From Swiss-Prot:
One of its GO terms (cellular component) is late endosome membrane. Its main location: membrane. The small GTPases Rab are key regulators of intracellular membrane trafficking, from the formation of transport vesicles to their fusion with membranes. Rabs cycle between an inactive GDP-bound form and an active GTP-bound form that is able to recruit to membranes different sets of downstream effectors directly responsible for vesicle formation, movement, tethering and fusion. Regulated by guanine nucleotide exchange factors (GEFs) including c9Orf72, which promote the exchange of bound GDP for free GTP. Regulated by GTPase activating proteins (GAPs) which increase the GTP hydrolysis activity. Inhibited by GDP dissociation inhibitors (GDIs). The keyword Endoplasmic reticulum does not apply. Its cofactor is Mg(2+). This is Ras-related protein Rab-39A. Interacts (GDP-bound) with C9orf72; C9orf72 acts as a GEF for RAB39A. Interacts (GTP-bound) with HOPS complex components VPS39 and VPS41, and STX17; interaction between HOPS components and RAB39A contributes to obtaining a functional HOPS complex that promotes membrane fusion driven by STX17-SNAP29-VAMP8. Interacts with BECN1. Probably associates with the PI3K (PI3KC3/PI3K-III/class III phosphatidylinositol 3-kinase) complex. Interacts with UACA. Interacts with isoform a of RASSF1. Does not interact with isoform c of RASSF1. Switch I, switch II and the interswitch regions are characteristic of Rab GTPases and mediate the interactions with Rab downstream effectors. The switch regions undergo conformational changes upon nucleotide binding which drive interaction with specific sets of effector proteins, with most effectors only binding to GTP-bound Rab.
Length: 217
């Protein structure tokens, strides 16, 4: 029997090269850390695709399409084309790499420039928190930046699985709540949110899972 999911969200993962975006996605979708010398942790060339179902409430599942983007400048033109069709994103930096943190605002501004006229919800992720002794960015500083930029902040480690599941759950639930409030709408021609496979009997919160030709969110 086909798995029931009420929505499909397309999420993009952005940030500098080597901050661990691919390792985070492997941990979340496959439940394992591929290892520092695994090809899975090599810098992404262009864009890679991952997928997983996430249950946000009992009996309510969201299908996540996850796009892992290259951090290198030569692939940025490819990355930019994926912003517009994403409803959410993880903006990842390495807590042991000060420069990756300093580039957070650049990534955010680039995303905002290319997402118009749609809305994208971001979560700021401080990765590699298992390397706390090598930290170059304090939690307090990262939290200040996230507040200034209107994002939530979480620290994760793909190596020991710290907060990996939680980070994807937080962003997925935030988007789901905005849909229920009518602040994010399903629209024809936009891939960010799609209605899913639901039973004939739907709950009131799911009755709005219908595409709209116009949205004034």
């Amino acid at each position: 029997m086909e798995t029931i999911w009420i929505y499909q969200f397309r999420l993009i993962v952005i940030g500098d090269s080597t901050v661990g975006k691919s390792c985070l996605l492997h941990r979340f979708t496959q439940g394992r850390f591929p290892g520092l010398h695994s090809p899975a942790c090599d810098p992404t060339v262009g864009v890679d695709f991952f997928s997983r179902l996430l249950e946000i409430e009992p009996g309510k599942r969201i299908k996540l399409q996850l796009w892992d983007t290259a951090g290198q400048e030569r692939f940025r033109s490819i990355t930019r084309s994926y912003y517009r069709n994403s409803v959410g994103g993880f903006l990842v930096f390495d807590i042991t790499n000060r420069r990756s943190f300093e580039h957070v605002k650049d990534w955010l501004e680039e995303a905002k420039m290319h997402v118009q006229p749609f809305q994208i919800v971001f979560l700021l992720v401080g990765h590699k928190c298992d390397l706390a002794s090598q930290r170059q960015v304090s939690r307090e500083e990262a939290e200040r930046l996230s507040t200034d930029c209107g994002m939530k902040y979480i620290e994760t480690s793909a190596k020991d699985a710290t907060n990996v599941e939680e980070s994807f759950t937080i962003l997925t639930r935030d988007i789901y709540e905005l849909i229920k409030k009518g602040e994010i709408c399903i629209q024809d021609g936009w891939e960010g949110v799609k209605s899913g496979f639901v039973p004939n009997t739907v709950h009131s919160s799911e009755e709005a899972v219908k595409p709209r030709k116009e949205c004034f969110c």
